[in-house]
Amino acid sequence: MKIFSQRDFLWILPLSLGLGAVLSSLQLGNWLIGWLGFSFLFLLSFSLLTLSTKWANGGGLPLRGLRDTPLEKRSGLLDHQKPLAWMVILAFTLRFVGGVVTYLALPVYGYVDDEDQSAGFAYTDAHRRDAQAWDLASSDLPIYDAFNKTYAYDQYGGLLAFSALVYRYLSPDVHRPLMLVLLSAFMAALALPFLWKATNQQWGAKVALASGWIYALYPESLLLGGSAMREPYFWAFSAFALWGFVNFVNRTPIQSQETLYSRVWLALGIGGMLLLSPIVALATIIILVGWFYISSGHGRVSWWLAIAVVVVFIAGLFLLSSALDRNGELGGGSPIGIINNFMREAVKWDVYQLERDSGWVQKLFDEMPEWMRLPFVTVYGIFQPVLPAAFFEPTKLIWRIIAILRAVGWYTMLPALILSVGAAAGQSVESKRRLFLWLSFIVWMWIIITALRGGGDSWDNPRYRTILFLWQAILAGNVWVWWRESKNAWFQRVFAMELVFLIFFGQWYANRYIHFGPQLPFALMVICIAAFWAVIFFWGLWRDRKRSV
């Protein structure tokens, strides 16, 4: 089947050249060099996105689960020939345009005294890594120097090396940060066709549609996907690995060529993650090993597969420990010991920073037993970014808009992730139930670990959490389908619990910043929230039991 034709170039080529001219005009340096560099990146991005979208959509073949749906009932997003293309278009456009607008607006409407914002960067890590990438690209040093400890702002070196490579050969005259913004948007969008194809094959069209739209439109991923960060690359490599694994697990004995393709995509995904962050590769391996164990019916595993997993896992441990302990100060004596020491020291530091930077947290820490501090930091981290704070904390307009969008996105996603366990338990097929329970367990373990690692930071915490966003989108998509089919009342009840939390905390923040309403002591407010939650929870149990009688 031909999935890419010369007709595609009739729009790809002129659009790439036109957008390349616009981007080159927005950046300093020789216009012709910038135009050629940007045009090449646009041409590559549009070609690969078109190719992968057509491939994932099967050239217009019906989605699994929609074949028997009458044509007159397939409207809007249920038309199998429309949704994936629109997802990819919106995913790329929103991230790229948002990244360009942020880059141009922050030096004007942000905090101009801030070094990162005055340079057009929303993330400090992105700014520092970008600056070091340009320094390396404009020097006489080899690109692989990105992996030594001289360049400390990229802990693992992979993205720094790639960024320097782009600058050295596509922007040799001047520093053009928008090239990396373009590549981030491209990588984020490239994950969608693989996510779509894998979820459609594994769970059907409805989960594929819901997961795809959540992935395409989630605000935190829009901001990260429009920045020169590692997360968009994580999502793309995770999607490659997901598709390779799903295709491998669901292959038939006579599909030897499919087995080869599956191994290639799986290796590409895991290998890419190892270069960017070994810990993400290790987390993905754990997810897929558990998945394979569940799908194989606890049967025997081939020797080559077991050896490959063990070798890659051990290599990942060594890469991670060496990256974390570049200066040899953590000790531990082994990769696991080094990683354990790093996590312990990192959590201590984050708790200290949270207490130091917030007067009311200092007050709460003074009033609570010491054993409660770590659980408090964990819960506080899970609720970051706090939606009421986004409305009331004093800041610039551009940052208020960004904060509200990020918080609304998380507080929409959070109930779905809470319900993911219930949705998994409600699956009629045993293997499907076990698989979604496994994915829910891993995602929530990751959320808790990142809440500890990021503390109460409203930027690092959500960013760490979003590293496994691809899997969160799958869980949330399954919850949406489960609720639409079952009309389970716990969907509304969990949202009601969240509404109670937002009302109380909204009033607390309103009193703190604009002196609106009475001031409840923090402990009393928590007790009130817990009481309302208990009423909703036990009333829900009573209603369910009454209906079942």
PLM regions with names:
Residues 223, 244, 248, 256-284, ...:
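Membrane-interface alpha helices of multi-pass inner-membrane proteins
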